Regions:
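Sec-dependent N-terminal signal peptides of Gram-positive bacterial secreted proteins and lipoproteins
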Residues: 3-31
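Acidic, metal/ion-coordinating pockets
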Residues: 26-55, 59-415
Length: 415
């Protein structure tokens, strides 16, 4: 009898629960009329359903978030600057600003850091070897303290070109020391290599679904040469080697960046080498060509590619910073653009391409004395007062505008 009563009670409770759940689903349950056992069952079932729904929603959210993470933007920002040419006036002042015990290059770049920081791909031509293996040296055999490298990486530069005529100023030992330093910074460096195997390995980086390859070549190395068995550089007259490298890079990357140290010093006009080899680089697969060496600015333009796309060429970015005593050498450019890739066709285009003028500034009391306040300004912020203080005789707004006349209006951006 007790068993039968117990079974009946269980049956009643179960039926009540089922009826109640049905009522809940219809939105018309009066829980005040349920006994405790039935209410407990209902609450448990309801909580289970809610948890199941929450788990399902949470799972869907995770799946959506994962899908969002897996989809790159296929667009990125890029800046490139010219020769980071560290004369003795610059590093001597940095040593004073560091209290005589360390180098502080903050003043040198403080006015232009805003153009670099936060950029996805930021490229600089490091014109002087960065190494602490020798004492800092100036023209004609440059060597700069590693504090220079620390500063430019801190600014946001993550790609360093070493393809320039001063790369062998301290011989193979100095070059290897500089390569060792850059290896510690976690950035891409190219244009000079520790071995043939290193030279044959194309340097790449991928940003937001866009893969970049970097190659660098120079016209000469000031009469200094390597033995051939160890460290390597590639000269612009080695066209067969350059062609093979660019074609290989074109197969493995969306954007092939080629740094060329070419042009006639202190001349805005293009020379024969520039006009002859640049179209070849584009024909072989170069997408962005960055020109340095002349220490003055030159024109920039799009060139048609064989595949129907367009490459862009900055023929001469001038100096990023220096204390060269020449009015033309005080004017440089920051190249700036957006790189956009169509994920369906893999076609890459450059948008919002700019050439932003900058001014190397320094003051002094005599030609053979120390020059000070060595820094670089955006031309947009270079006041008449600064023109008056600049130590280079004859440096005027008119002389700047003369240099800027070589830049097409569609790209010139004074900002």
């Amino acid at each position: 009898m007790k068993y039968r009563l117990l079974c009946n009670k269980i049956t009643v409770v179960a039926l009540s629960a089922l009826l109640s759940l049905s009522a809940v689903s219809c939105g018309r349950l009066d829980t005040s009329k349920l006994d405790g056992n039935a209410l407990t069952v209902i609450e448990a079932e309801s909580k289970a359903e809610v948890k199941k729904t929450e788990d399902s929603s949470s799972k869907k959210e995770v799946e959506v978030n994962e899908e969002e993470k897996e989809q790159p933007s296929y667009t990125c920002s890029l800046v490139c600057v010219g020769d980071n040419l560290i004369h003795d006036n610059i590093y001597n002042e940095a040593l004073k600003l560091g209290g005589g015990e360390k180098y502080d290059f903050t003043q040198a770049y403080e006015h232009v850091t805003k153009y670099i920081e936060g950029t996805d791909v930021a490229i600089i031509n490091q014109e002087t070897l960065v190494t602490d293996s020798v004492e800092p040296q100036s023209y004609p055999m440059f060597a700069s303290p590693t504090a220079v490298g620390d500063k430019i990486v801190d600014m946001g530069f993550n790609v360093v070109s070493m393809s320039n005529n001063h790369v062998l100023d301290q011989g193979e030992e100095g070059l290897i020391s500089s390569l060792d330093y850059w290896d510690t910074k976690g950035i891409v460096h190219y244009g000079a290599y520790r071995s043939q195997e290193d030279a044959d390995t194309i340097k790449t980086m991928e940003v937001n679904g866009i893969k970049f390859a970097f190659l660098g070549y120079m016209e000469h190395t000031n009469g200094n040469y390597l033995s051939g068995d160890g460290a390597q550089v590639i000269y612009l007259d080695e066209e067969d080697k350059i062609k093979a490298q660019i074609e290989e890079a074109d197969k493995m990357a969306d954007v092939v960046v080629v740094s060329c140290h070419y042009g006639t010093e202190i001349q805005n006009e293009l020379n024969e080498q520039q006009t002859e080899i640049t179209p070849k680089l584009v024909e072989w697969g170069a997408d962005l060509i960055i020109g340095t060496q002349a220490h003055t600015i030159s024109t920039c333009e799009y060139l048609d590619k064989p595949d129907g796309g367009q490459a862009f060429v900055y023929y001469g970015l001038g100096n990023f910073i220096s204390t060269m005593y020449d009015t033309k050498s005080l004017v440089g450019l920051i190249g700036k653009l957006n790189v956009v890739k169509d994920p369906d066709t893999n076609e890459v285009t450059f948008e919002n391409v700019k050439a932003i003028p900058i001014i190397s500034h320094f003051e002094g009391d005599s030609y053979y004395g120390d020059w000070y306040n060595c820094t670089v300004y955006p031309y947009a912020e270079y006041t008449d007062e600064l023109f008056a203080k600049n130590y280079v005789e004859g440096f005027t707004r008119e002389s700047v505008e003369q240099c800027l006349s070589y830049i097409p209006d569609e790209f010139l951006s004074i900002e």
